[in-house]
Amino acid sequence: MQTPSENTNAKSDSLDEPGAYLIEENVALPKDIFHSYLSYWIYEAAHCTPVMLLSLVIGVLISIIILFHDNENCVGVSVGFLLIFSGILVIVLILRFGPQISDEDFKCKLLMEIITRKPTVKGKEWRTITYKMNQYLFDNDLWNTPYYFYRDEDCHRYFLSLIKGRTFKKQKESSASNVKDAQSNDETAGTPNEAAESSSFSAGPNFIKLLTKAAEIEQQFQKEYWRQEYPGVDEFF
């Protein structure tokens, strides 16, 4: 029998669902579960219904070409359809795996995790955040599997894409009050008339406040990371 730690290090090439041995103390990400990125990608594609249907059609067309290779008309028609369905498959793959998750609640939850856990650059906190965000996407039907982010660096890069190119004003409030205000608009909205005059209604956290606070945390740890790597470069920050 394998111990939990042995299970965590186990690798799998099959398309079967990997074992449920993800634990909070030593989370396993897709990079740890799958033998290679190719096997991970095949697993993800296999859980996309349009991809599977198109792959089945392409497989049938290839079989027809092989079986009836002496029939020029049959081969010609099959090759034509093969090219068409192959092109459609490429488009579906691009549309499925190309765009980033744009769900607002997902972004807010990610920012909440960053504000709460305060992950350092390349810190182990990113593994936990990545695992929790993968699970959130799966539980809320935003992704077909609990393995959206292949590794913690991918989740970190996704966060950086949210703040890249943005200009933030430094918040004067304390960290605790910032998070509290972002989590509860009811406490700061005042009366309905006051709310109508000062701000628009929001059913969830204040995204801009969350983004600003998370960006401040990232900037702080980026400075600390580079100062440790290259002492004496404070003038560049």
UniProtKB/Swiss-Prot annotation:
Give residue spans on the Extracellular membrane side.
Answer: 69-74
Q: What is the lineage of its organism?
A: Eukaryota, Fungi, Dikarya, Ascomycota, Saccharomycotina
Where are the annotated segments for Disordered? 174-201
Role noted for this protein: May be involved in endoplasmic reticulum exit trafficking of proteins.
UniProt keyword annotations, A-Z: Endoplasmic reticulum, ER-Golgi transport, Membrane, Transmembrane, Transmembrane helix, Transport
* Location(s) in or outside the cell: Membrane; Endoplasmic reticulum
- At the top level, the lineage of the source is Eukaryota
Query: By its UniProt entry, which InterPro entries does this protein fall under?
Result: DUP/COS
Entry's Gene Ontology BP terms: vesicle-mediated transport
Subunit structure, as described in the record: Interacts with PRM9. Binds to SEC23/24 of COPII coated vesicles.
The entry sums up its family as follows:
Belongs to the DUP/COS family.
One cellular component term from this protein's GO annotations in UniProt: plasma membrane
In its miscellaneous comment, the UniProt entry states: Present with 1254 molecules/cell in log phase SD medium.
Q: Which species is this UniProt entry from?
A: Saccharomyces cerevisiae (strain ATCC 204508 / S288c) (Baker's yeast)
Q: What is its main location?
A: membrane
Protein name per the record: Pheromone-regulated membrane protein 8
Q: What topology does the record note for this protein and the membrane?
A: Multi-pass membrane protein
Q: Which regions span the lipid bilayer? A: 48-68, 75-95
Which Pfam families is this protein grouped with? DUP
Membrane side Cytoplasmic: which residues?
A: 1-47, 96-237
Q: Where is this region: COPII binding?
A: 236-237
